[in-house]
C-alpha cells in the first residue's frame, strides 16, 4: 500500500515537473519573441501613435525616423568614423543613445501633429516665400537620402513634401503661440519649458508593442 502511494506521489511530482518545464520553455519563447527586433519596412502601414484619437502609421512618421537616424549617424561618424555602432550603443543620461534618438523622433512627430492641428484651427497658411523655403528643405532632405535611402524609407517624394508643408505650418502655429504669450519660440520646442503645458492638453498613445522592438538605426 505504501509502495503504491509513493509511486503515485512520484508520478504526480514528475507530471508537475514536466508541466513547469514546458511552461518555462513557453515563457522563454514568448519573452524572446517580444524582444525580437521588427523591421520598419514590414510595419509601415501599422499604427505607430495615436494623438487625440487620430492614428498615425509608421509611414506617416517616416521623415522623423529618417531624420533622427541621419543626425545620429553624423554624430556617430564624428565619434568614431570606422565603428559608428560604438556611438549608437553608448549609455548616457540613464539611456542608450539609440533609444534616446528613437524616442526623440516620436516626440518630434507628436509635437508637429499637435501644432499642425493648431495651424488648421487658426486657418494659417504659408506665404509663397515660406512655401519655397520648405520645398527647398524637402528637396535637400530627399537628395541627402540618396537612392538607396529613398528605397529603404519606402515613401514617395510627394509624401515627404507633404510632411514638410505640415511642419512649416506647425512651426507657424508655434510662433503664433509664442508671440501670443510673449515668450521665445524655442519655449515650445519638444524640450522647451512651456511645451509640456501644451502636451498636457492632449492625449497620445504609442504602439509600444512595435515601438519598443523597432530596429531603429537600420531604417535607411
Where are these regions (language model features)?
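Short, low-structural-confidence N-terminal segments
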Residues: 1-97, 193-220
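Alpha-helical transmembrane segments
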Residues: 25-28, 108, 123
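Charged, solvent-exposed helices and adjacent loops that form client-binding or oligomerization surfaces
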Residues: 70-101, 120-193
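Alpha-helical scaffold segments that flank or form the walls of functional sites
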Residues: 103-106
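Short, structured surface segments that line ligand/substrate-binding pockets
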Residues: 108-111, 119
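Short secondary-structure junctions and interdomain/linker hinges
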Residues: 116, 145, 180, 201-206
Amino acid at each position: 500500500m505504501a509502495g503504491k502511494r509513493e509511486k503515485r506521489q512520484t508520478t504526480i511530482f514528475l507530471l508537475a515537473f514536466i508541466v513547469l518545464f514546458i511552461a518555462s520553455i513557453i515563457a522563454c519563447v514568448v519573452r524572446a519573441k517580444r524582444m525580437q527586433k521588427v523591421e520598419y519596412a514590414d510595419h509601415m502601414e501599422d499604427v505607430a501613435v495615436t494623438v487625440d484619437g487620430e492614428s498615425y502609421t509608421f509611414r506617416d512618421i517616416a521623415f522623423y525616423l529618417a531624420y533622427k537616424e541621419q543626425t545620429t549617424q553624423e554624430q556617430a561618424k564624428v565619434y568614431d568614423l570606422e565603428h559608428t555602432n560604438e556611438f549608437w550603443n553608448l549609455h548616457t543620461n540613464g539611456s542608450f543613445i539609440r533609444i534616446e534618438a528613437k524616442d526623440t523622433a516620436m516626440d518630434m512627430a507628436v509635437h508637429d501633429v499637435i501644432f499642425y492641428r493648431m495651424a488648421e484651427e487658426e486657418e494659417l497658411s504659408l506665404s509663397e516665400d515660406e512655401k519655397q523655403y520648405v520645398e527647398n528643405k524637402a528637396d535637400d532632405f530627399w537628395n541627402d537620402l540618396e537612392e538607396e535611402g529613398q528605397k529603404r524609407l519606402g515613401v514617395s517624394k510627394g509624401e515627404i513634401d507633404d510632411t514638410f508643408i505640415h511642419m512649416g505650418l506647425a512651426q507657424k502655429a508655434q510662433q503664433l503661440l509664442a508671440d501670443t504669450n510673449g515668450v521665445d519660440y524655442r519655449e515650445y520646442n519638444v524640450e522647451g519649458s512651456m511645451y509640456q503645458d501644451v502636451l498636457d492638453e492632449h492625449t497620445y498613445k504609442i504602439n509600444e508593442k512595435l515601438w519598443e522592438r523597432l530596429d531603429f538605426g537600420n531604417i535607411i
